[in-house]
Amino acid sequence: MLLELDEPLLQRIYQLEPDPRPEALFADTELGTHVEQGPWLIQLTPDSPLLSAYRQAPEQWPGVLLSSGRPVDELLAHLRAMLVVQFEGERKGILRYYDPQVASYLFAATEAVITWLGPIEQLFWHGPTWADRSENISHWRSLRSESTNHGAPPKGRLILDRMQIAALEQQQLEAFAYERWQEHSHAEFNQILGYMQQGIASGFDDEKSLGAYLEARLTYPQHLSHPQIASGQVQFRLQQLQSWLEATPAPSESQG
């Protein structure tokens, strides 16, 4: 099991698993100075009470479950190689694939399963997407490797492809939409997500301006869309939008 730990959770682990042999994933990596902020690999036996506890209440265990017949050192080497990935040329970033929420987006968009799983035979997790969470939907997910030849860990960084990048960007967008949806209980999650997509398409692509755009749209929900906004400074463009929303009758009124 690979999960993020705090002191109470670590105590529970030792109560359920006498010899979990925790291994810090960030150790011996370029993230080594942040070991305590990273996840830990916990070794389980098939009849482990911890495994049973995870299956019964997965939301209490923030991580993913791995099945592998390979040595622990080999598994750790691969998991560590997945921590920092490359994308869009020379850009790189930390990949929190061990977060069930992130896993639900990333691995659903992963085609090169053998490359990403390496010595992992099967990956399990229980985590909704943000859209699922807005509807109180959650279920088990899994990813299985069809290969028995796992080979050595990747020599260079793993590279995110376009589908994976798009999935992770969608995860970030939906996370922001979910946060705003919790603040606006009168609105539907998909309504807020749709507004945000329109806002980004209109050039409001940073958190502050997108938040202001969203507030304006939620104030006038009768408008499903708006005309193209003239170019200029962000505040000027927001004022243009606000003026149009205030002055334009609702569609039903204009047709009456």
Protein language model regions, located:
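Signature for HUH/AEP ssDNA processing cores
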Residues: 42-50, 54-69
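A contiguous, surface-oriented mixed alpha/beta subdomain in the mid-to-C-terminal portion of proteins
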Residues: 12-28, 36-42, 46-49, 72-73, ...
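Short, hydrophobic/proline-enriched secondary-structure or compact coil segments at domain edges
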Residues: 1-8, 63, 214
